[in-house]
């Protein structure tokens, strides 16, 4: 039993290693485009270690990151950089994720990055949407190969946060 537990832990860590390394590789060869942001590390913890959690489902990872990044870009474009705008960006991201039933805690950091980094709408596409899409596809394939339960796009209507 302990061996199976340790094997599962290793496979979770190995999956995160592979995915983040690939994003890091893309990042190192494209100086004009960022592929990797810190919240993706936390997304991998959910997608690999607690893959059955509603917070780790593809819909939550993808749209949680996108909506949160959009929240940060919007607040920055309206208010600029201040401690109030940073707090408002995170608060708006949480509100939007809750309303859209796409709560993904790592995505809560995206507005901070967007506002403090003075990011524009391009930040939402690259690295956020592109990287989150890669993570979702990787998690679906990796978890399927390991015969783990992991929700796919066809399962979105059955998610607890989808109703």
Predicted regions and their residues:
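Pore- and pathway-forming membrane helices of multi-pass small-molecule/ion transporters and channels
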Residues: 35-50, 90-120
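Alpha-helical transmembrane segments and their membrane-interface boundaries
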Residues: 1-66, 70, 74, 79-87, ...
């Amino acid at each position: 039993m302990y061996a199976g537990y340790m094997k599962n832990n290793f496979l979770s860590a190995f999956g995160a290693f592979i995915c983040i390394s690939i994003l890091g590789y893309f990042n190192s060869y494209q100086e004009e485009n960022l592929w990797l942001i810190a919240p993706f590390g936390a997304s991998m913890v959910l997608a690999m270690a607690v893959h059955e959690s509603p917070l780790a489902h593809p819909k939550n990872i993808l749209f949680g990151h996108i909506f949160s990044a959009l929240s940060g870009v919007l607040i920055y474009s309206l208010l600029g950089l201040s401690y109030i705008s940073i707090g408002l960006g995170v608060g708006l991201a949480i509100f939007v994720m809750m309303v859209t039933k796409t709560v993904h805690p790592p995505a809560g950091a995206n507005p901070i990055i967007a506002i403090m980094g003075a990011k524009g709408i391009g930040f939402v596409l690259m690295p956020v949407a592109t990287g989150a899409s890669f993570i979702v596809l990787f998690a679906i394939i990796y978890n399927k190969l390991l015969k783990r339960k992991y929700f796919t796009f066809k399962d979105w209507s059955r998610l607890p946060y989808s109703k």
